[in-house]
A protein has these predicted regions:
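Helix-to-loop junction immediately C-terminal to a conserved catalytic motif
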Residues: 54
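Catalytic Walker B motif of ABC-type/P-loop ATPase nucleotide-binding domains
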Residues: 160-163
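Conserved ABC ATPase signature
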Residues: 135-139
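Conserved ABC ATPase "signature" region
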Residues: 102, 106, 113-131
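Conserved ABC transporter NBD signature motif
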Residues: 62-73, 77-78
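The feature captures the beta-strand-to-loop junction immediately N-terminal to the Walker
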Residues: 39-41
């Protein structure tokens, strides 16, 4: 095990006073410069695992460590080191695609110059510039997914968690989305993708769990 790997060690999580088991004694290791896919049926605890990594859900037992830091015990640090694209995107009424991306970068403390440069670049790379100034709640489901993806990757953290990133996305931009993930992996980022699309897993990921 290397310190730069994300180490998930024997984590378990239950809800409803133990009646619902979200995940049970999960152990795995994620690596920089790699795209890892997590596949499984609905209700298998995939989304719960992502939320545990970023610190939104605390496991009942076990630990998650990165660079010697427990992300379970340091949820604030986890949110600084990890970016997440959630399974569902709820755009705010009247907020444009461009504004959605810019706002998350400002929250991260990115300089105003970088906010505009990074936003412009991700819009271009995903070929969604023509919708940049449309309100998010007026966009199609696929474009809302792309908005959420762009928000997670425009100024990427060390670890990037993506929950069903290509759902409802058209074939051309599905490919662009995976190409963007590969670019980030080549830059050293750790990409962890939840998906049901086995064809995409076989074509684009380095390994799957």
């Amino acid at each position: 095990m290397k310190a730069n790997n994300l180490i998930i060690d024997s984590i378990s999580k239950t809800y409803k006073k133990g009646k619902i088991r979200a995940n049970d004694n999960i152990s795995l290791e994620l690596y920089p410069s790699e795209i890892t896919a997590l596949i499984g049926h609905n209700g298998a605890g995939k989304t719960t695992l992502l939320n545990q990594i970023i610190g939104n859900a605390k496991p009942d037992s076990g630990d998650i460590t990165y660079k010697g830091i427990s992300l379970v015990k340091n949820s604030k640090v986890a949110r600084e080191l990890v970016s997440i694209m959630p399974q569902f995107h709820a755009p705010l009424e009247g907020v444009t695609l461009r504004q959605s991306i810019e706002s998350i970068l400002r929250i991260k403390g990115v300089s105003e110059k970088q906010v505009h440069l990074c936003t412009k670049q991700v819009l271009k790379d995903l070929d969604i510039e023509q919708w940049a100034d449309q309100a998010g709640n007026k966009l199609s489901g696929g474009l809302q997914r792309l908005t959420s993806f762009a928000m997670a990757v425009a100024y990427p953290s060390d670890i990037i968690l993506l929950d069903e990133p290509t759902n409802d996305v058209d074939p051309i931009r599905r490919k662009l989305t995976w190409q963007y993930m590969r670019k980030l992996a080549k830059e050293g980022h750790m990409i962890f993708v939840v998906t049901h699309n086995l064809l995409e897993v076989e074509q684009y990921t380095d390994r799957y769990i």
